[in-house]
Amino acid sequence: MPTVSMRDMLQAGVHFGHQTRYWNPKMGKYIFGARNKIHIINLEHTVPAFNEALAIVKQLGSQKKKVLFVGTKRAAQKSIKEQAERSNMPFVSHRWLGGMLTNYKTIRASIRRYRELETQSQDGTFEKLTKKEALVRTRIMEKLEKSIGGIKDMGGLPDALFIIDVEHERIAIQEANKLGIPVIGVVDTNSDPAGVDYVIPGNDDAIRAIKLYATAVADACIEGAADSASVPNKDEFVEEKAADAE
């Protein structure tokens, strides 16, 4: 199972929190102290919390369940998109659309529209249109790609959310909470951990730290999926048993 060590976290700067004046008292138990008016996160809490989260993600992957990667702030966008795609998981790396979970019916209609436009752009339909109409459709498609391209293959609500910066993604957390979808979240010293089922106390601004989290979660998804592929399904097992009996 993929695990992340304290050394990995130190090298990525996971232990650096926010300025002491911006702290959230609810994060007090995860703070080791302060240096140069910056809170230092106690990695003795972070390491086991993150590795527990990875075990849960791996289990979800082995059950062919979907983990939605969410990170829409600039520092998180690249890692979230790359690692979600690598692990064949859905993602939101631009703006979170209100109702993305709680009003999934409407989102599904937008996904259908996006797929139609995608097909039209590939099958020559756009070439038969006027330049103006083709441009209008291309712009709509690009806009949809940005907002829902990462969830077009999700096929329904996700089974868990993995979030970078819970303060920035508060709407996503509220929607997940309403629907009983578990939330795994990286929570910095300035954030409120309320609504996060699996709190990972850590730096949510440093690109290296974000890459570390996203890569490890993607690795756990991939390992889980590999475990799932290596376990024969019940029908195959019954067939093999019958063949042996003959």
From Swiss-Prot:
Annotated GO biological processes are: translation
CDD domains the UniProt entry points to: RPS2 (cd01425)
Show the coiled coil region(s): none
User: Which residues are connected by disulfide bridges in this protein?
Assistant: none
Cross-referenced InterPro entries, in alphabetical order? Ribosomal_uS2, Ribosomal_uS2_bac/mit/plastid, Ribosomal_uS2_CS, Ribosomal_uS2_flav_dom_sf
Q: Which cellular components does GO assign to this protein?
A: cytosolic small ribosomal subunit
Q: Which GO molecular function terms does the record list?
A: structural constituent of ribosome
Question: Which keywords does this Swiss-Prot/TrEMBL entry list?
Answer: Ribonucleoprotein, Ribosomal protein
Q: Which family does it belong to?
A: Belongs to the universal ribosomal protein uS2 family.
By what name is this protein known? Small ribosomal subunit protein uS2
Organism from which the protein derives: Saccharophagus degradans (strain 2-40 / ATCC 43961 / DSM 17024)
